[in-house]
Swiss-Prot record:
<comment type="similarity">
    <text>Belongs to the universal ribosomal protein uL23 family.</text>
</comment>
<keyword id="KW-0687">Ribonucleoprotein</keyword>
<dbReference type="GO" id="GO:0006412">
    <property type="term" value="P:translation"/>
</dbReference>
<dbReference type="InterPro" id="IPR001014">
    <property type="entry name" value="Ribosomal_uL23_CS"/>
</dbReference>
<keyword id="KW-0689">Ribosomal protein</keyword>
<dbReference type="GO" id="GO:0003735">
    <property type="term" value="F:structural constituent of ribosome"/>
</dbReference>
<dbReference type="GO" id="GO:0019843">
    <property type="term" value="F:rRNA binding"/>
</dbReference>
<dbReference type="GO" id="GO:1990904">
    <property type="term" value="C:ribonucleoprotein complex"/>
</dbReference>
<dbReference type="InterPro" id="IPR012678">
    <property type="entry name" value="Ribosomal_uL23/eL15/eS24_sf"/>
</dbReference>
<keyword id="KW-0699">rRNA-binding</keyword>
<keyword id="KW-0694">RNA-binding</keyword>
<dbReference type="Pfam" id="PF00276">
    <property type="entry name" value="Ribosomal_L23"/>
</dbReference>
<dbReference type="InterPro" id="IPR013025">
    <property type="entry name" value="Ribosomal_uL23-like"/>
</dbReference>
<comment type="function">
    <text>One of the early assembly proteins it binds 23S rRNA. One of the proteins that surrounds the polypeptide exit tunnel on the outside of the ribosome. Forms the main docking site for trigger factor binding to the ribosome.</text>
</comment>
<protein>
    <recommendedName>
        <fullName>Large ribosomal subunit protein uL23</fullName>
    </recommendedName>
</protein>
<dbReference type="GO" id="GO:0005840">
    <property type="term" value="C:ribosome"/>
</dbReference>
<comment type="subunit">
    <text>Part of the 50S ribosomal subunit. Contacts protein L29, and trigger factor when it is bound to the ribosome.</text>
</comment>
Length: 100
């Protein structure tokens, strides 16, 4: 079993975008920003234990950081990892519900 401390470090934040919102409505998929060293099993366990839902599948992608200019200097944003977590039928997780 994964330690509680590690579970809290795996999930960083929900990723809110137009694509993420459409996925949530159509295919019951939630998108999270996760730690770069997190694997699919850790992500699934973290979502199941923290939000008390059943996970069907997890897909991950590493988003490469963009090169940006700061005046005359060139800089680069950090790489980050995104996880698409598909919940089982009948399960739901709504972050926006309490904000209204």
């Amino acid at each position: 079993m994964i330690q509680q401390e590690r579970l809290l470090k795996v999930l960083k934040a929900p990723h809110v975008s137009e694509k993420a919102t459409n996925n949530a409505e159509k295919s019951n998929t939630i998108v999270f920003k996760v730690a770069l060293d997190a694997n699919k099993v850790e992500i699934a366990n973290a979502v199941e234990q923290l939000f008390e839902v059943k996970v069907d599948s997890v897909r991950t992608v590493v988003v490469k950081g963009k090169t940006k200019r700061h005046g005359a200097r060139m800089g680069r944003r950090s790489d980050w990892k995104k996880a698409y977590v598909t919940l089982q039928e009948g399960q739901s997780l709504d972050f926006v519900e309490g904000a209204e």
